[in-house]
């Protein structure tokens, strides 16, 4: 691939985008290191996700390989070519298991395939979840402490002058903030079927659970921001809640939206627009979210 020609076009497009007159829609890719681990051609050592999550040296090596792969092989409207990377930026990467694990779910590892979390309560034990106060009183404990340990490991490797194919490490990414969303986390804890049913047949419990989850999200975000030297409230805040695609607009507006608003009030000043990531058929929510 002619990186020089590609990058020349990208620089022109970026300049046009800055001026608000881009000649075409820019093509972007959202990617993460699971692309390396899950592909036997890219992961001949068959490093598993369990090894990746638990060993910061392995995590660093995989992320270096991933950033090289993105720069060399995955075409999109960004500057490409490993030689054009100024540095490699590692970050503690716990995929989508962090928040479930924070609240008591066991991580389910599947070799080189994406890990998940196991439902940790059923109809008879779901009230026990609310008795676990550690996510509220010790938001930097448990798996979050492992995340911070990995962060410090990456900082130390940078200070020691670690390089990958001549590229130094940049400042590690500040991971663990944001959220997959209160209702999505509820589905992880008690299962999607139970969560949807309880919105109708045990609404008092679901409101208590969603408030508990939201408070835990707020506590973790504020604690990590303090740890990273950031203000407790940012100018804007973005989050996800993919599982609201299971709900009607009326149910979302009445029962879930108040918790989204609570997170926004607690975690941002509103000086800049916020955003939400949604999967599936979510277009029915858009007008309400914009308002």
What is each residue range found by the language model?
Residues 52-104:
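Membrane helical hairpin/interfacial module
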Residues 63, 72-74, 78, 119-129, ...:
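Generic hydrophobic/packing signal
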Residues 70, 97-114, 157, 182, ...:
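Alpha-helical structural context
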Residues 84-130:
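A contiguous, low-structure linker/loop signature
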């Amino acid at each position: 691939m002619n990186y020089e020609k590609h990058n020349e076009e990208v620089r022109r497009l970026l300049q046009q985008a800055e001026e608000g007159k881009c000649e075409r829609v820019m093509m972007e890719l959202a990617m993460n290191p699971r692309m390396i681990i899950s592909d036997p051609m890219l992961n001949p050592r068959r490093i598993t996700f369990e090894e990746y999550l638990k060993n910061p040296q392995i995590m660093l090596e995989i992320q270096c390989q991933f950033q090289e792969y993105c720069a060399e092989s995955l075409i999109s409207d960004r500057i490409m070519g490993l030689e054009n990377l100024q540095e490699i930026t590692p970050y503690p990467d716990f995929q989508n298991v962090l928040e479930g694990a924070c609240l008591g779910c066991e991580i389910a590892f599947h070799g080189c395939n994406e890990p998940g979390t196991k439902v940790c309560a059923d109809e008879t034990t779901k009230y026990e979840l609310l008795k676990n106060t550690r996510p509220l009183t010790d938001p930097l404990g448990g798996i979050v402490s492992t995340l911070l340990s990995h962060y410090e490991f990456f900082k130390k490797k940078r200070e020691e002058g670690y390089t990958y194919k001549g590229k130094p490490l940049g400042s590690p990414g500040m991971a663990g903030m944001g959220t997959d969303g209160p209702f999505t986390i509820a589905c992880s804890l008690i299962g999607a079927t139970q969560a949807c049913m309880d919105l109708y047949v045990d609404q008092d419990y679901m409101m208590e659970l969603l408030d508990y989850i939201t408070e835990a999200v707020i506590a973790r975000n504020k604690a990590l921001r303090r740890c990273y030297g950031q203000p407790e409230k940012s100018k804007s805040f973005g989050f996800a809640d993919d599982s609201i695609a299971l709900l009607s607009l009326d149910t979302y507006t009445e029962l879930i939206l108040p918790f989204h608003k609570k997170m926004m009030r607690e975690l941002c000043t509103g000086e800049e627009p916020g955003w939400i990531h949604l999967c599936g058929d979510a277009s029915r929510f858009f007008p309400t979210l914009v308002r």
